[in-house]
């Protein structure tokens, strides 16, 4: 596939090949990562990358947009069908930019926004002080009940009544339970707030009908197009309100972006088309089954799972009982070709760069075709590594590392990833 790259720039080609090898040989358990289809990849590498197309279909600031208009319109129509909504903007370059545009469509800098605390499972763009959201807006954070580790809706309502936010954000990057969007909308209506749902992590589950559709309750829904949706890296915004749609479009362009990435939008259209097929629902069902099985097996082997389990594609592991940090666990596992990410947890006492937990997700290994029996093997390998961590650097005995790495490679060889890309 990359013959011209190999000939024209051997250095970049070598990097691409090394990354391909890493993905093929390793176990990818980062919850926000997945493997796109070759068709999605081809669309991203198409001639559409050459075209500037500021504006929207049939309302561009450049000529020659006849065919990119078709690509964007196709992406819009497919995603509207996928999520049963009236209006869609598929131009955001990322989930973060989708969130920024959604906020600026209905609020002004200095307004109050309520979002889930990062340490409780939220996202940087939900009000972190180091993010644009925390710098532009007055932030009120909510979280989970520290005993049950699930959302405390009564406390969320109390905070909303006290602070009267302009926006309430629901959704997160590390929350493993089903979110009650109906309750969130009731709270928002009580204080006259806009409800914005960030479904970036569970969009694929929503598309498959395995997670409540936030479009039914939210004023605005944002998402990435990768993660469980298994498309290219990018963002999207949905709404059923025509006036909000107009405001969203202005916020995206000319508000925060210039020319859209038409090659990525075409790849989004391909991914949405794939998600409309029956086999996509079966795939999403396997993701959840695998996540539940992996969490349960890890628990059986002595690890503590935050909130006691998962309803989705991901879960958090509390490493405090093991006296191991998330940073050390991430490094140790990566040395054995298992990738996870360190993650803050409720009652967090460590820095976000160290953390007390790790986040684990099953979309990527499910894409490879792995099932419950493989989750049992993976759990055993994870625990073997964690139980043998010797220091904060994530050092493990060489014989353990090589034993686990060998088992990982034997497993991934049975479930090849991209057969025709080398």
Curated annotation (Swiss-Prot):
Q: What reaction does this enzyme carry out catalytically?
A: (6R)-5,10-methylene-5,6,7,8-tetrahydrofolate + glycine + H2O = (6S)-5,6,7,8-tetrahydrofolate + L-serine
Keywords, ordered alphabetically? Amino-acid biosynthesis, Cytoplasm, One-carbon metabolism, Pyridoxal phosphate, Transferase
Entry-linked PROSITE patterns: SHMT (PS00096)
Give the binding site residues for (6S)-5,6,7,8-tetrahydrofolate.
118, 122-124, 243, 351-353
Identify one Gene Ontology CC term for this UniProt entry: cytosol
Q: Which family does it belong to?
A: Belongs to the SHMT family.
Q: What's the protein called, per UniProt?
A: Serine hydroxymethyltransferase
Question: Which gene holds the coding sequence for this protein?
Answer: glyA
């Amino acid at each position: 596939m990359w013959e011209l790259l190999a000939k024209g720039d051997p250095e970049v080609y070598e990097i691409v090949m090394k990354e391909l090898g890493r993905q093929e040989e390793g176990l990818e358990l980062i919850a926000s990562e997945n493997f796109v289809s070759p068709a999605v990849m081809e669309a991203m590498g198409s001639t559409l990358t050459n075209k500037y197309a500021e504006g929207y279909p049939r309302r561009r600031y450049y000529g020659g947009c006849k065919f990119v208009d078709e690509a964007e319109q196709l992406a819009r129509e497919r995603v509207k069908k996928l999520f049963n909504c009236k209006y869609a903007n598929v131009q955001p370059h990322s989930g973060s930019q989708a969130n920024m545009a959604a906020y600026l469509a209905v609020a002004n800098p200095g307004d109050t926004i309520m979002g889930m605390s990062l340490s409780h499972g939220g996202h940087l763009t939900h009000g972190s002080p180091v993010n644009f959201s925390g710098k532009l807006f007055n932030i009120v954070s909510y979280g989970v009940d520290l005993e049950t580790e699930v959302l405390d809706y009564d406390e969320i309502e109390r905070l909303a009544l006290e602070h009267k936010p302009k926006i309430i954000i629901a959704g997160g990057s590390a929350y493993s339970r089903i979110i009650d969007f109906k309750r969130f909308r009731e709270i928002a209506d009580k204080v006259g707030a806009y409800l914005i749902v960030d479904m970036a992590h569970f969009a694929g589950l929503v598309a498959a009908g395995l997670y409540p559709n936030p479009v039914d309750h939210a004023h605005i829904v944002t998402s990435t197009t990768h993660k469980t949706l298994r498309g290219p890296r990018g963002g999207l915004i949905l709404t059923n309100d025509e006036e909000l749609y107009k405001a969203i479009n202005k916020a995206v362009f000319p508000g925060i972006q210039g020319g859209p990435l038409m090659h990525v939008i075409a790849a989004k259209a391909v991914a949405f088309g794939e998600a409309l097929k029956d086999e996509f629902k079966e795939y999403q069902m396997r993701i959840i089954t695998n996540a539940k099985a992996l969490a349960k097996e890890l628990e059986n082997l002595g690890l503590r799972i935050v909130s006691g389990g998962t309803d989705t594609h991901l879960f958090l592991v509390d490493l405090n009982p093991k006296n191991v940090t998330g940073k050390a666990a991430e490094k140790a596992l990566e040395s054995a070709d298992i990738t996870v990410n360190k993650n803050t947890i409720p009652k967090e006492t460590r820095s976000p760069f160290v953390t007390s937990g790790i986040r684990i997700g099953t979309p990527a290994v499910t894409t490879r075709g792995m099932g419950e029996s493989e989750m049992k093997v993976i759990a055993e390998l994870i625990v073997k590594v964690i139980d043998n961590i010797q220091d904060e650097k994530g050092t493990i005995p060489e014989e353990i590392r090589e034993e686990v790495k060998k088992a990982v490679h034997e497993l991934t060889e049975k479930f090849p990833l991209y057969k025709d890309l080398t």
